[in-house]
Regions:
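Conserved N-proximal alpha/beta basic substrate-recognition cap immediately N-terminal to
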Residues: 7-110
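A short beta-strand motif that forms the metal-chelation/ATP-contact edge
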Residues: 51-56, 123-126, 175-177, 243-258
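Anionic group-transfer/hydrolysis microenvironments
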Residues: 58-59, 128, 167-168, 176, ...
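Phosphate-binding site of ATP-dependent enzymes
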Residues: 139-228
Length: 275
């Protein structure tokens, strides 16, 4: 197979660029070892015509447009340009709501509003569009005054829309998947995080490891991924003290740092299944 491989721009990988690049390089290496013609394309460069597949971690609009154009010519993109765009916070939140997938209660906010709506505290204020690339894109909010200040900061940064999600007490669990929901050999892993790219996990504290249905989480995660369209994905959920599962994040092609070796092998399997 002729495969174009595109890494993630460092600007889209805050505090995670080394881990993202490690997965990218390992996957490219394994593709080459299997005899596939793998061409690395820097973010911003043209994608050559005639590719059978495109493995990418990009999130830049220009490259997603170029990937979409090659998809129309017959290239299989993993993840597709459309699916990657669906991982924008506002979009995946809407998709999960439509699919009936449990999330913390949330409210859509306009940062230009002069009257703050009545909300329950504490909660999380999140930039609505795109992915988190700045520490203030997701903020823990304990009071109305903190909310007003945080909304003002987003407005100053030129961010027009935000999402306010109620805080759910419980354990944060990270999950990772590769494959389709109907794939018998799909890859799924989960673990309790110790530290994320911005340290948000510290708010929930040391995991209590509340019991929950792991099979239900896997089913829910792949249902969400299928609705969004991603075949390589990661995410975060809250496990409440009574074992309820609340999805709080879904993202395209995470670094899989805890499972890099086996994840790279699974990604290669997925890519080569497209021929």
């Amino acid at each position: 197979m002729k495969i174009a491989a595109i890494p993630r721009a460092s600007a889209d990988s805050p505090n995670m660029s080394e881990k993202d690049m490690a997965l990218f390089r390992l996957t490219v290496e394994k593709l080459s070892e299997e005899g596939h013609c793998t061409v690395v394309i820097e973010d911003g460069d043209e994608i050559p015509a005639g590719c059978d597949a495109i493995f990418h971690m990009t999130r830049t609009a220009q490259m997603l447009d170029r990937i979409a154009a090659r998809e129309k010519e017959g290239a299989a993109a993993i993840n597709s340009a459309a699916a990657t765009r669906n991982c924008s916070r506002s979009t995946f939140t809407e998709i999960l709501t439509r699919e009936g997938i449990e999330q913390p209660p949330y409210t859509l906010l306009d940062t230009s509003m002069s009257i703050t709506p009545v909300l329950r505290f504490p909660g999380w204020l999140k930039k609505s569009d795109g992915w988190s690339s700045h520490p203030d894109d997701v903020q823990y909010i304990a009071t109305k005054e903190a909310l007003i200040n945080a909304i003002g900061n987003l407005r100053t940064r030129g961010i027009a829309k935000a999402i306010y999600s109620e805080h759910i007490e419980g354990d944060i669990v990270k999950f990772y998947g590769i494959g389709r929901h109907d794939d018998r050999d799909k890859f799924f892993r989960l673990h309790y995080p110790t530290d994320g790219k911005f340290g948000y996990e510290k708010i929930n504290g040391v995991p209590h490891k509340y019991p929950f249905d792991e099979e239900k989480l896997q089913t829910t995660a792949f249902k969400a991924a299928a609705a969004i369209g991603v075949e390589i994905f990661g995410g975060d959920c809250i496990i409440s003290p009574d074992g309820e599962i609340y999805i709080i994040d879904i993202n395209d092609c995470p670094s899989f740092s805890a499972y890099r070796e086996e994840a790279a092998e699974e990604i290669v399997r997925l890519i080569t299944s497209k021929k």
